[in-house]
């Protein structure tokens, strides 16, 4: 019995020594052995089918391999698939960081605080967005793209040529930008082109509201119930009106202007008379002082 025990103990010691020697000769840790197995399996992996954990279908390799390659990638040159030149890392890394990003604080390049995701994700979602249905924040139904894309295109747009939908040739920017600037505009001070101080909004907004305005009910400032349009539109049409031919409603062929303009001039004259008295009546042949409105 004692002999059998000693013999079995000797065999166990020999086996441990033998396997340890083999491992020392190969000098390969267990984790690297697994990596070697994965590398041998790469050609057999179907990117569209079930994948082993840690495998990226975009790059056709494992994440650990990609991370080791980061310092060698040139952002301005050819890049491996799934690499973002804006962030200097792969999309899969960025997606894992999303919950940690503060929209109101410092943000990594390429991150949109409006959508809470990276631009590259949003661009992939464009074909799935319904312009007439619920839309993700920062998406413009007029242009069919996100505002951040449109802002990058501004220098390339020709104001006098074909323009993308939602672009204002008067302001050289998109309507959505102008609407965000409304609270900062001073009606009595310098105003951006296309802004109406009477209505406190841009002309393009007012034109879209025309079908909803009731001529007999409350009307927005600057709207003429006679013409069914705003005064600023009518003033632009003055040179095209023929006094002797058909005329738009509210136009006076005697004065060559609209009645609403004349009423505003009467009000200014009345204010002048109240402040300075009646303009003096001059004798024939004398030069009278010219009245200048307020």
Curated annotation (Swiss-Prot):
Any S-S bridges, and between which cysteines? 282-288
Main localization of the protein described in the UniProt heading: secreted
Using the UniProt annotation, give all residue ranges assigned to the region (Disordered).
28-230, 238-257
- What tissue specificity does the UniProt entry give? Expressed by the skin glands.
Among InterPro entries, the record links this protein to: Bradykinin
Enumerate the Pfam families for this protein: Bradykinin
Query: Which terms in the GO cellular component ontology are assigned?
Result: extracellular region
UniProt feature, compositional bias: Basic and acidic residues: 28-44
Location of this chain's protein in the cell: Secreted
Family, per the entry? Belongs to the bradykinin-related peptide family.
**Designated name of the protein:** Kininogen-1a
């Amino acid at each position: 019995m004692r002999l059998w025990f000693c013999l079995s103990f000797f065999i166990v010691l020999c086996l441990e020594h033998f396997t340890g020697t083999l491992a020392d000769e190969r000098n390969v840790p267990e984790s690297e052995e697994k990596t070697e197995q994965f590398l041998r399996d790469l050609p057999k992996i179907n990117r569209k089918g079930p994948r082993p954990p840690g495998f990226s279908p975009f790059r056709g390799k494992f994440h650990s391999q990609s991370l080791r390659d980061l310092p060698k990638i040139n952002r301005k040159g050819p890049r491996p698939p799934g690499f973002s030149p804006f962030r200097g890392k792969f999309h899969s890394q960025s997606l894992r960081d999303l919950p940690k990003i503060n929209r109101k604080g410092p943000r990594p390049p390429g991150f949109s605080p409006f959508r809470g995701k990276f631009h590259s994700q949003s661009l992939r979602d464009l074909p799935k967005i319904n312009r007439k249905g619920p839309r993700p924040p920062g998406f413009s139904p007029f242009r069919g793209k996100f505002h951040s894309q449109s802002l990058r295109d501004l220098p390339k747009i020709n104001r006098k040529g074909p323009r993308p939908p939602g672009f204002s040739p008067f302001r050289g920017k998109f309507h959505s930008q102008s609407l965000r600037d409304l609270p900062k505009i001073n009606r009595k001070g310098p105003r951006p082109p296309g802004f109406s101080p009477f209505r406190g909004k841009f002309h393009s907004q007012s034109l879209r509201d025309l079908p909803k305005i009731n001529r007999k009910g409350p009307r927005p400032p600057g709207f003429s119930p006679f013409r069914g349009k705003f005064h600023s539109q009518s003033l632009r049409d003055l040179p095209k009106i023929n006094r002797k031919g058909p005329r738009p409603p509210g136009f006076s062929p005697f004065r060559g202007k609209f009645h609403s303009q004349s009423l505003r001039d009467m009000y200014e004259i009345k204010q002048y008379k109240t402040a300075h008295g009646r303009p003096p009546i001059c004798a024939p042949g004398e030069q009278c002082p010219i009245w200048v409105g307020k």
